[in-house]
C-alpha cells in the first residue's frame, strides 16, 4: 500500500496528541482522512490544516458509531487511537469505578471497531492499527487498570488478525505500543504522577525518558507501517522516538 491516494483512512481519536499527528501525516500523504473525535473545536482546527481531512463528531465507544462509519466509509486504513484518561492514583486509593475506566472505554473501542472491521468486512488488503501503550508491557502501577486495558487491546488485535486469516479476509491488524510522551493528555498525566511518586520534578523525569515521541514522529511511523509488506509485519510494535521496534 505504498500509494495512499484515494485510500480512505479513518483515524478514531484524531483531535489531539498522537492521533492528530497521525491524521495530518496521512492527509499530507494524499489519503482522504476521516477524523473522528468528540471535540468540535479541535476537529475544526484539524480540518483547516488540509483539504484531505473531513471530520465526524462522535463518541468512539458507541457501537452504533463504529457500525455507521465503517459501513459508510469502507476505509482501507483504520487507526484506533481514542481512549479515556486514566485516574492517576495508587492502587489503594482507587475505587473499582476509577480503576476500570479504561476497561469501559479503551477495551470497548478496540473490541467494537475490530468487530465491525471483520463483520463488514473491510476490503482485502486493508490495514487496521490499534494504538495500545508501552504500559501493556511495562505495567503502570499509578494508573489503575490502564496497563491491563492496553494489554487487552494488544490481545484483541491479535485475535482479530487471526480471525481475518482464518476467514481469508486479507485484513492486516497490528498493535502499536507508544512510549509515554508529553505530547498527549494521558502522557502528561503520567509524567506528573510518576515524577511526584519518585520525588522528582517533571523536567527531571522527562530527562530520564530520553527523546520524546512527538505526534509528527508517530505519524511518520504509522505511514511506514501501513506501507510495509503485510508479510513482514509482526503482531505488535513498540513506538519510541527512534521509530517502530519489535518487542524483545
Where are the model-predicted features located?
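C-terminal helical subdomain
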Residues: 175, 195-248
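Rossmann-fold cofactor-recognition segment
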Residues: 49-63
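Catalytic loop of short-chain dehydrogenase/reductase
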Residues: 127-167, 177-184
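Catalytic Tyr-X3-Lys loop
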Residues: 92-111, 129, 153
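Conserved glycine-rich cofactor-binding loop
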Residues: 15-16
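Amphipathic alpha-helical dimer-interface segment in Rossmann-like NAD(P)H-dependent oxidoreductases
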Residues: 71, 105-126, 161-162, 166
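Conserved mid-core segment of classical short-chain dehydrogenase/reductases
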Residues: 83-100, 142
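Conserved glycine-rich Rossmann-like NAD(P)H-binding loop of the short-chain dehydrogenase/reductase
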Residues: 29-45
Amino acid at each position: 500500500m505504498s500509494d495512499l491516494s484515494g485510500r480512505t483512512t479513518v483515524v478514531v481519536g484524531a483531535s489531539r496528541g498522537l492521533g492528530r499527528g497521525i491524521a495530518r501525516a496521512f492527509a499530507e500523504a494524499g489519503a482522504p482522512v476521516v477524523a473522528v473525535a468528540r471535540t468540535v473545536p479541535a476537529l475544526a482546527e484539524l480540518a483547516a490544516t488540509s483539504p484531505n481531512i473531513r471530520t465526524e463528531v462522535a463518541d468512539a465507544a458507541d457501537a452504533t458509531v463504529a457500525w455507521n462509519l465503517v459501513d459508510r466509509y469502507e476505509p482501507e486504513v483504520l487507526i484506533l487511537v481514542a481512549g479515556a484518561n486514566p485516574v492517576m492514583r495508587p492502587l489503594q486509593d482507587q475505587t473499582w469505578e476509577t480503576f476500570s475506566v479504561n476497561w469501559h472505554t479503551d477495551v470497548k473501542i478496540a473490541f467494537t471497531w475490530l468487530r465491525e472491521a471483520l463483520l463488514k468486512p473491510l476490503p482485502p488488503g486493508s490495514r487496521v492499527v490499534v494504538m495500545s501503550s508501552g504500559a501493556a508491557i511495562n505495567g503502570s502501577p499509578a494508573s489503575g487498570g490502564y496497563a491491563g486495558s492496553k494489554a487487552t487491546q494488544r490481545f484483541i488485535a491479535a485475535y482479530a488478525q487471526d480471525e481475518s486469516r482464518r476467514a481469508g479476509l486479507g485484513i492486516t491488524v497490528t498493535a502499536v505500543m507508544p512510549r509515554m510522551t508529553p505530547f498527549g493528555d494521558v502522557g502528561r498525566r503520567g509524567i506528573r504522577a510518576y515524577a511526584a511518586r519518585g520525588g522528582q520534578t517533571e523536567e527531571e523525569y522527562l530527562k530520564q525518558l530520553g527523546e520524546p515521541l512527538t505526534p509528527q514522529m508517530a505519524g511518520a511511523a504509522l505511514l511506514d507501517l501501513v506501507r510495509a509488506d503485510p508479510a513482514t509485519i509482526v503482531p505488535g510494535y513498540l513506538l519510541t522516538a527512534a521509530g517502530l521496534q519489535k518487542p524483545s
